[in-house]
Amino acid sequence: MTTKISILQRSLLSAIALLVCNFAIGQTLVSGQLNSGRIPTPTMLFMNVTPDARSAAMGDAGVAISSDVNAIYWNPAKLASADKDLGFAISYTPWLRNLVNDMALYNIAGYKKTAKGQAFGFSINYFDQGLFQATTATGTSAGNFNSKEYALTVSHARKLSNTLSLGLNLKYINSNLLGNYQGAGTSAMQPAQTVAADLSLYWNNTSEKNWNYTYGLMLSNISGKVSYGGLDKNFIPTNLRAGIAAVKNVDDKNKLTFTLDLNKLMVPTPTKTDPTGSNSSAIGGIFGSLFDAEDGFGEELKEFTTSLGAEYLFNNTFALRGGFFNETEMKGNRKYFTFGVGLKLDQKYGFDFAYLVPTGTSSPLANTLRVTLLAAINNDTPKK
C-alpha cells in the first residue's frame, strides 16, 4: 500500500515528523488546533514502541517484572538475574494494520550470562514504515520512498549485590524517512543518526514470604539532538520509567504477578506560543522536562502514563496476561486494554501473543497484535 504525503508545510521535516509521531503513538490532536495539549513530539518514536508480546499483554509494563531476553529493552539490569544461561527472542508487530498493510516492527534479541553475576546482550529493532509517495504542492509525484528506522543495541548487566543489579545499553539509531528527497524551497533530506545510552537498576527483594517485590528504574535513549538535514535539530524520545512488581507463589504450580509502571518522556513540553518545542540542548531538555510545563506541576503530572499488568502462570508452562494503559486526554489520550497468552515447551522454547483493545472507537492502534518466539538454555553454572 502506498501512502501519499503532500509537501505543503514550511518544513518537510516537521510535516513528516508530526505524521510519524501521531501515527506511531496514536495521539489524538484536537481538530484545527496544532498540538493544543502541548504534547511532546520527539522524533524516532519507534524507540518507545513495545517490541515484545509479554509486556504488551500486561499494559506495556516491563521494567520490574521477572527477567527474560527482552529485558534488554525494558531494563537490562534484569539480565544479571535471568534464570537461564543463554536466551534468544524474535518479535513481530504489524503496525496500524487497520489503516495500512505494509508497516511492521521487528525485534531480535539475545543474551549470555557469564560468571560473577554478569550478562551481555544484543538486540536489533527494525521499524518498516512501508512505501510512501511524496507529492508536491501541485499534486505532482515526487517519488516513492521506503521509510525505515532501526536501532542496534549492545547490553551489559552486573550484580552489585545479592539484590541489586545495574544495566547499561549502548545503541546506534538510524532514521531514514525520505532518503535524500529535496522539495522546493527546502534543504535536502538525509537520514538522521545518533548514538544513545540507557541506564537501569533492578532490585529483587528475594524472601521466603508469601509476596516477593521487585523494583525497576530505567532512563533510556540518552543522546544528543538529531537532524534530517537543514538547520532544525530534533529531540529523540529520552524516557524515564519506574515500576514495581509483586509476585506470589500460590503453590508449587500456580504463580501470580501484578505490576505497575510509570513512564514520562524526558523532552521539553511545547509552549502555548511555540508548538514546535524548545531550543534547549538535549541534556538541558532532559532535566528541564520535569519543570517546564506552562500550567505547572499539575500539567507535569499529566505527562506521566500508567501501565497496569497482571500475569497468571501455571506450572511454569502456560500464562494468562492482561493489562491497562492510560494516558491523560491532554497529553495524547491513549487508553487501551491488553490481553495475551504465553506457552512454554520443555522449559526451553516459548510463544507469547498479545492483543490490544482501545477504549475508544476510532483509535489507529485498534486490533494491534504482537507475537514473540523465545528460546532459552538452562544455566548449568553455579549462581553467584
Residue ranges and their predicted role:
Residues 1-29:
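Bacterial Sec-dependent N-terminal signal peptides
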Residues 27-384:
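Subset of outer-membrane beta-barrel
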